[in-house]
């Protein structure tokens, strides 16, 4: 395995002292990079993710080009679902479309057991390739969390309100619990397999869970998240686990009492406020990705965020959501350099101004 010479991200995830703030970006791989767009002219997303050499190349690009302190595996949260019998298609301009949406207990019953080594060997081969030969920074593996996966599976695709998902959850609580159990087992096995293959940390993406109240989260979702985290930690107790959601500030207190290591927040929550709600966790975030299209505003916001981030150990600079395709790659490089240089100055100061 290649030696990790830049461990800033891992130190921050463990709430250790660092000499500069680590930075990486959700959806940093692909998206706006010209090299990626050339690949997309020749290969589909499916083809890229199923070819370890190409997928590893795309994953490594932002490390080389932007100088970020961690790589995140280039995959889609839908990747494991076909291995459970879900007929999913990624449609350009739409996103994931499920051709056999869940409508009943019978549909949930049909979901099969997921074995990562059999169903997604190309994911594990990509990780091994990156960890063994290509990276000197930590590699972050990831999985979609059960609520977000279930919302696609029930709605049949992206949704603005999740009415079908929530009504199914309320109307069929016992069936919902079975669905969560199946998705939870899959997610735990998937994350464990990624760490076994060489991932240094893993992130749970629960993009849409902010649509739930805290009470509903505690009743319908928390048990399965606790199960996932518990199972991963039982096998890999020292591997950092990150929880990332959007519009979910009201759920921070739920995550404080779970054995998570890092909690990601978006621009609706300040770093200082988040720390008060999750004092034992490292914080990741929280620049609004829209500011990347307004360079002056972007750096001003980054400075404001950094001034809060450096006040305590355990801070990782990131976005509150993923990079937009319209973002110029040079802006991400400029921002990365700024975060490194500015945070190094701030961390040396006794009085932050």
UniProtKB/Swiss-Prot annotation:
Keyword Lyase set for record: yes
GO cellular component terms attached to this protein's record: cytosol
Catalytic activity: uroporphyrinogen III + 4 H(+) = coproporphyrinogen III + 4 CO2
UniProt: substrate binding residues: 27-31, 46, 76, 152, 207, 321
Swiss-Prot/TrEMBL site (Transition state stabilizer) positions: 76
InterPro entries given in the database record: UROD/MetE-like_sf, Uroporphyrinogen_deCO2ase_HemE, Uroporphyrinogen_deCOase
Major site of localization recorded for this protein: cytoplasm
Intracellular or extracellular location(s): Cytoplasm
Enzyme class: lyase
SUPFAM superfamilies tied to this protein: UROD/MetE-like
Domain of life: Bacteria
Record keyword Disulfide bond present: no
A Pfam family it matches: URO-D
Protein task: Catalyzes the decarboxylation of four acetate groups of uroporphyrinogen-III to yield coproporphyrinogen-III.
PANTHER family, per database record: METHYLTETRAHYDROFOLATE:HOMOCYSTEINE METHYLTRANSFERASE RELATED, UROPORPHYRINOGEN DECARBOXYLASE
Quaternary structure note: Homodimer.
Protein name: Uroporphyrinogen decarboxylase
Species of the source: Listeria monocytogenes serotype 4b (strain F2365)
């Amino acid at each position: 395995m290649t030696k990790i010479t830049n461990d800033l991200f891992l130190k921050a995830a463990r709430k250790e002292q660092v000499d500069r703030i680590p930075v990486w970006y959700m959806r940093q791989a692909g998206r706006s990079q010209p090299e990626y767009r050339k690949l997309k002219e020749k290969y589909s997303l499916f083809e890229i993710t199923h070819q370890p050499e190409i997928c590893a190349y795309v994953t490594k690009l932002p490390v080389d080009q932007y100088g970020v302190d961690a790589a995140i595996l280039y995959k889609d949260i839908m990747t494991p679902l076909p291995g459970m019998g879900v007929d999913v298609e990624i449609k350009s301009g739409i996103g994931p479309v499920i051709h056999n949406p869940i409508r009943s207990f019978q549909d949930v019953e049909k979901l099969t057991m997921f074995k990562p080594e059999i169903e997604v060997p190309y994911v594990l081969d990509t990780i091994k390739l990156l960890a063994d030969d290509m990276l000197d920074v930590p590699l972050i593996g990831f999985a979609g969390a059960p609520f977000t996966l279930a919302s696609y599976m029930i709605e049949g695709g992206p949704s603005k309100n999740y009415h079908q998902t929530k009504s199914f959850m309320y109307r069929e609580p016992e069936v919902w619990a079975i669905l969560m159990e199946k998705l939870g087992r899959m997610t735990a096995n998937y994350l464990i397999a990624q760490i076994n293959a060489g991932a240094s940390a893993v992130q749970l993406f629960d993009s849409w869970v902010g649509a739930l109240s805290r009470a509903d989260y505690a009743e319908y979702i928390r048990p399965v998240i606790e199960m996932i985290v518990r199972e991963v930690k039982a096998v890999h107790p020292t591997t950092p686990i990150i929880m990332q959601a959007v519009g979910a500030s009201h759920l921070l207190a739920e995550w404080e009492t779970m054995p998570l290591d890092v909690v990601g927040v978006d621009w609706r929550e300040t770093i200082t406020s988040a720390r008060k709600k999750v004092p034992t966790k490292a914080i990741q975030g929280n620049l609004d990705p829209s500011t990347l299209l307004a360079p002056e505003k972007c750096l001003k916001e980054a400075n404001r965020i950094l001034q809060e981030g450096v006040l305590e150990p355990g801070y990782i600079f990131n976005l509150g959501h993923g990079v937009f395709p319209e973002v110029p790659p040079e802006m991400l490089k400029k921002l990365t350099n700024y975060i490194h240089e500015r945070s190094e100055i701030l961390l040396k100061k006794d009085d932050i101004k």
